[in-house]
């Protein structure tokens, strides 16, 4: 009975999208593996790959191959995408989330 009281239910929604969570992972660890991103965010490795590819395609992340691994660089000066936040930069968001 005590274990049930101590465990927290998985939230059904979050304030941040999976894209934001992936961006935070990459900013914290530029050499992070897709499997580690997936585990940290709580998504499949395939979903992590899709999100990273979308961030790369849109120019928010640069992917550089180093041997058998990828290294990522977040472009912090780009504006956020939503009209309510477009006057802010990606770096502003990361500063709040990583601090």
Describe the predicted segments one by one.
Residues 65-71:
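Short, Lys/Arg-rich nucleic-acid/phosphate-binding segment
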Residues 2-21:
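Short alpha-helical segments that sit at the start of domains
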Residues 24-28:
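Short, locally clustered residues in the helix-turn-helix/winged-helix DNA-binding domain
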């Amino acid at each position: 009975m005590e274990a049930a009281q101590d465990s927290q239910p998985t939230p059904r929604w979050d304030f941040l999208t999976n894209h934001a969570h992936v961006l935070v992972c990459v900013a914290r660890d530029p050499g992070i593996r897709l499997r580690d991103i997936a585990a940290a965010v709580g998504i499949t490795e395939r979903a992590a790959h899709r999100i990273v590819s979308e961030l790369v395609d849109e120019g928010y992340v640069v992917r550089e191959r180093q041997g058998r691994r990828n290294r990522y660089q977040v472009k912090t000066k780009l504006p956020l995408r939503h009209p309510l936040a477009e006057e802010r930069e990606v770096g502003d968001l990361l500063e709040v989330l990583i601090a």
